[in-house]
Amino acid sequence: MKQLFRQWYDLSEIKKELTTRNWFPATSGNISIKVSHDPLTFLITASGKDKTKTTPDDFLLVNHQGIPVLETELRPSAETILHTHIYNNTNAGCVLHVHTTDNNVITNLYSDAVTLQNQEIIKALDIWEEGATINIPIIENDAHIPTLGEKFRKHIQGDSGAVLIRNHGITVWGRDSFDAKKRLEAYEFLFQFHIKLLSIQGGVSNGANSYS
């Protein structure tokens, strides 16, 4: 029970911080944190909640299938299946899914992936080579969540990572809440920088294909 309260507090603090950045517009987005490994349980945001508010009903505890562990009238976030795929296939401890203007714009500029390089902040992703290059996959959105989940699952590689969904934000996971938030901040910085650079240069660069 102590671990549950500790993780609840941790997730609540992340929600507050990301809310101040307006990364949960119009109740969008969902975040989760692992509570136990065996059996697998994790806290996830309840569906349809205004994340600018803090209430006792912000999160609910679910199992490895995304089913509530305790009796509740709350419904887990619609994209819970993305979180279950990550927790069931990695040792990740936290998953963050947010919608921002920048990450949505990026998915309209590129088709299957966006390539970013030569930025010091890439080191926040535990990539230490000078002039490092990263590729972030982009998948098509799908209103049928199980289908979206299968597309997403193919790109889960390791205990940390990120996947962009066309016009549907980014999902980032990490070893724990600190790692996941750090990675999310790094990706959003890179997107913002890249878009500003393109606006100055006047077009899509880095040899990637534009999407239309």
From Swiss-Prot:
Pathway: Amino-acid biosynthesis; L-methionine biosynthesis via salvage pathway; L-methionine from S-methyl-5-thio-alpha-D-ribose 1-phosphate: step 2/6
Cofactor: binding details: Binds 1 zinc ion per subunit.
GO cellular component: a single term: cytoplasm
Swiss-Prot/TrEMBL cofactor(s): Zn(2+)
Enzyme class: lyase
GO MF, one example: zinc ion binding
Pfam families according to UniProt: Aldolase_II (PF00596)
GO terms under biological process: L-methionine salvage from methylthioadenosine
Keyword Disulfide bond carried by entry: no
E.C. no: 4.2.1.109
UniProt keyword annotations, A-Z: Amino-acid biosynthesis, Lyase, Metal-binding, Methionine biosynthesis, Zinc
Transcription regulation as UniProt keyword: no
Reaction(s) the record says it catalyses: 5-(methylsulfanyl)-D-ribulose 1-phosphate = 5-methylsulfanyl-2,3-dioxopentyl phosphate + H2O
Binding site for Zn(2+): 97, 99
Subunit relationships: Homotetramer.
Function: Catalyzes the dehydration of methylthioribulose-1-phosphate (MTRu-1-P) into 2,3-diketo-5-methylthiopentyl-1-phosphate (DK-MTP-1-P).
Family: Belongs to the aldolase class II family. MtnB subfamily.
HAMAP family assigned: Salvage_MtnB
Protein name: Methylthioribulose-1-phosphate dehydratase
Organism listed in the record: Bacillus mycoides (strain KBAB4) (Bacillus weihenstephanensis)
